[in-house]
Design a protein with these regions (language model features):
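A generic secondary-structure boundary signal that marks alpha-helix termini
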Residues: 26, 42-43
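Short, structural beta-strand-to-alpha-helix junction motif
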Residues: 29-30, 53
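Short, charged early-sequence alpha-helical segments and their helix-coil boundaries
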Residues: 43-73
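Polar low-complexity intrinsically disordered regions
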Residues: 1, 33, 72-73
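Catalytic phosphate/metal-binding cores of nucleic-acid and nucleotide-processing enzymes, i.e., regions
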Residues: 18, 34-35, 40
């Protein structure tokens, strides 16, 4: 049997994403928000956005939104 991640983990992730989107960039469309953020992850963090787990993506997103210090220096 394949062990899968708990799907309920996504509620906290998306609630935090929604909070950051509504607080930091409320005028951006959803696609604009995600594409700009994912491009930033790839270009500034030199990280393929396909691979980070939710906790790492939230750390990046908080940094992108100006809520946290840079985790890479």
């Amino acid at each position: 049997m394949i062990n899968i991640r708990d799907p309920n983990r996504l509620y906290n992730f998306y609630n935090e994403v929604t909070r950051l989107h509504m607080t930091c960039m409320p005028d951006w469309r959803v696609g604009q928000f995600w594409m700009n953020f994912l491009g930033w992850v790839q270009n500034e963090k030199k990280c393929d956005p396909f691979f980070p787990e939710e906790s790492e993506m939230l750390t990046y997103l908080k940094e992108y939104c100006g809520e946290k210090e840079d985790i890479n220096g």
